[in-house]
């Protein structure tokens, strides 16, 4: 009996103390050492709950609106606002006022100029369309502009001078449709652009010139060649046609005449034109002596020499 009382008192003295601060621990879950219990009882694990530490960071989240925060439904003016797109299909930014827009355009132009300074070049082209393809002028112009747009080029000026009379016939055409255009494109595409005009049989002539800057002002067509020549009292339209017909025949004769003319400088500093001609047959015998004296100055082909003094720069 005394042994039982002694054992019960020892168990009571070993119960854990639970004060008010740790009152959240459940005493029923605290198990004692099995060596202090009855003999033959199963060992029980000791389980204790840990105290959670509170975060010292303050939570400033608040559902109330700040003074500078907009409230209410989303403005329909922003949802339904029409967006503007430029010529190249890019979305234009929104500007607060005209001054901000002007500043943006200036900075964008300066940036593009710096980036494309070494790649982009300005050119001017004049091309003539055959008169029998007068109805296809618009399609030809569209073809050229589409090519420039494909190569990221830009057209600065486009002038349609219409049908004009040619100074001379080209591919049996007396008139042609004139087009003047200033454009900007990378230098590596210039030969390809010229090939585009060369491959089109409707374009009978074209001329491409390099420019230092973009030209945008309108350029009126110059007066026609025949209207200018009409004021010349010595101008004859029929005579010009005859000259054009005999132009090919006269080219060979001019070349032969040029071969028979030479220029020399005499002792006095005068320029002497020496004209060589074929030696005539049937010359008189009385001139034989003079011919022998002049024979020293003749060329080996037996041509006659005629000298004439020509004033140069006088």
UniProtKB/Swiss-Prot annotation:
Keywords: Chloroplast, Developmental protein, Elongation factor, Plastid, Protein biosynthesis, RNA-binding, rRNA-binding, Transit peptide. Residues 49-73, 214-314 are annotated as: Disordered. Gene3D superfamilies: 3.30.70.60. One of its GO terms (cellular component) is plastid. It is found in: Plastid, Chloroplast; Plastid. InterPro entries: Ribosomal_bS6 (IPR000529), Ribosomal_bS6_sf (IPR035980), Ribosomal_S6_plastid/chlpt (IPR020814), Transl_elong_EF1B/ribsomal_bS6 (IPR014717). Residues 56-69, 295-308 have a biased composition (Basic and acidic residues). Residues 233-269, 277-294 have a biased composition (Acidic residues). One of its GO terms (biological process) is plastid transcription. Its main location: plastid. It comes from the Eukaryota. Expressed ubiquitously in roots, leaves, stems, flower buds, flowers and siliques. Interacts with CFM3B/SPRT2 in plastids. Prevents non-specific action of the splicing factor CFM3b during plastid rRNA biogenesis to improve the accuracy of plastid rRNA processing. Required for plastid functions such as photosynthesis, intracellular distribution, plastid rRNAs biosynthesis and plastid gene expression in roots. Involved in a sucrose-conditional process important for the organization of root lateral and apical meristems (e.g. establishment of RAM from pericycle and symplasmic connectivity), and subsequent primary and lateral roots development. Modulates C18 unsaturated fatty acid metabolism. This is Protein REGULATOR OF FATTY ACID COMPOSITION 3, chloroplastic. It comes from Arabidopsis thaliana.
């Amino acid at each position: 009996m005394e042994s039982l009382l002694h054992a019960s008192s020892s168990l009571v003295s070993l119960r854990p103390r639970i004060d008010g601060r740790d009152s959240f621990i459940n005493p029923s879950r605290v198990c004692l050492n099995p060596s202090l219990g009855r003999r033959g009882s199963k060992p029980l694990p000791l389980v204790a709950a840990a105290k959670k530490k509170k975060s010292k960071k303050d939570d400033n989240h608040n559902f109330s609106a700040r003074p500078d925060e907009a409230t209410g439904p989303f403005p329909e003016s922003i949802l339904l606002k029409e967006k503007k797109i430029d010529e190249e299909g890019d979305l234009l930014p929104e500007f607060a006022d005209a001054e901000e827009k002007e500043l943006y355009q200036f900075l964008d132009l300066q940036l593009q100029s710096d980036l494309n300074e070494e790649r982009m070049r300005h050119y001017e082209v004049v091309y003539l369309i055959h008169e029998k393809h007068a109805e296809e002028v618009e399609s030809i112009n569209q073809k050229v502009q589409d090519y420039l747009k494909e190569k990221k080029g830009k057209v600065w000026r486009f002038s349609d001078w219409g049908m004009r009379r040619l100074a001379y016939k080209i591919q049996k055409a007396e008139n042609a449709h004139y087009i003047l255009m200033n454009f900007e494109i990378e230098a590596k595409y210039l030969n390809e652009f010229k090939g585009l005009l060369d491959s089109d049989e409707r374009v009978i002539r074209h001329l491409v010139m390099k420019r230092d800057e973009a030209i945008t002002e309108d350029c009126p067509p110059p007066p026609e060649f025949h209207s200018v020549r009409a004021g010349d009292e010595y101008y004859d339209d029929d005579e010009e046609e005859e000259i054009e017909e005999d132009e090919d025949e006269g080219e060979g004769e001019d070349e032969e005449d040029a071969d028979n003319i030479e220029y020399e400088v005499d002792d006095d500093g005068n320029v002497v034109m020496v004209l060589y001609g074929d030696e005539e047959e049937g010359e008189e015998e009385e001139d034989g002596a003079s011919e022998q004296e002049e024979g020293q100055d003749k060329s080996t082909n037996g041509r006659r020499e005629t000298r004439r003094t020509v004033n140069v720069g006088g």
